Regions:
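N-terminal secretory signal peptides that target proteins for export/translocation
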Residues: 1-19
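Bacterial N-terminal signal peptides
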Residues: 24-35
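General marker for long, soluble alpha-helical cores
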Residues: 37-218
């Protein structure tokens, strides 16, 4: 008989815990929501933007685009590399327009510091060509290939269509082929599989005009 009250007590405690469980879950959920709300209301520290030389109106525009703490440091890199306030705002618009976080600060800074113009850098960003493959485009520019060629190669990459590689174009440039001829070969969509033949023809004395006549593309 002495064990019955103890059993009833345990059962009563279990029922009490079960009754409190929904309330406990709701309380925990409410606390989490409160923490998230506080975090979202915490103002972004834009001091790095100010230190990078970005003006008040541009910072205001960046805030209006809901710039994140991570993006603040990336945009600061771009501004420190010499791009304008307007360029910084445009870059954030481009990435957010694709539903992406702006993480290309190093790539864009490197491209611009290599001598590439603001317009070309922005165009590459618009084509989503400032990711892992940007190094080839930068190397092409440093090899003396025109920005028009760099952009045309980037367009083919973005479209997934054939184009001569940066290495092949650099070799042809070293063989004194004109930038205009190289641009036309890229426009024609000459695949890199034909590069060896073009290089051999050039080394055997073929002129720019002869090469353009022979390699008509698709």
């Amino acid at each position: 008989m002495g064990t019955v009250p103890a059993t009833r007590c345990v059962r009563g405690f279990s029922r009490a815990v079960r009754r409190r469980s929904p309330f406990t879950a709701i309380l925990v959920f409410a606390v989490l929501l409160f923490q998230l709300a506080c975090k979202s209301l915490t103002p972004i520290d834009t001091k790095p933007l100010d230190n990078a030389g970005i003006g008040y109106s541009a910072i205001k525009e960046l805030k209006a685009q809901h710039i994140t703490a991570t993006e603040v440091s990336e945009i600061a890199k771009v501004r420190q590399a010499g791009l304008s306030d307007e360029d910084c705002v445009t870059l954030l618009q481009i990435f957010h327009g694709r539903g992406e976080t702006f993480t290309a600060g190093d790539a864009i800074a490197s491209l611009h510091q290599s001598g590439m113009s603001e317009g070309t850098v922005l165009a590459l960003a618009g084509m989503d060509q400032v990711g892992l493959g940007y190094g080839e485009l930068q190397a092409m520019h440093l090899a003396g290939l025109s920005e028009a060629i760099v952009l045309e190669v980037a367009r083919h990459h973005a479209a997934g269509t054939p184009a001569l590689s940066g290495a092949s174009l650099g070799t042809l440039r070293n063989l004194r082929m004109d930038n205009g001829t190289l641009l036309e070969l890229v426009r024609r969509g000459i695949p890199d599989s034909e590069a060896a033949e073009i290089i051999a023809a050039r080394r055997h004395g073929s002129t720019d005009a002869e090469i353009l006549r022979h390699f008509s593309g698709s």
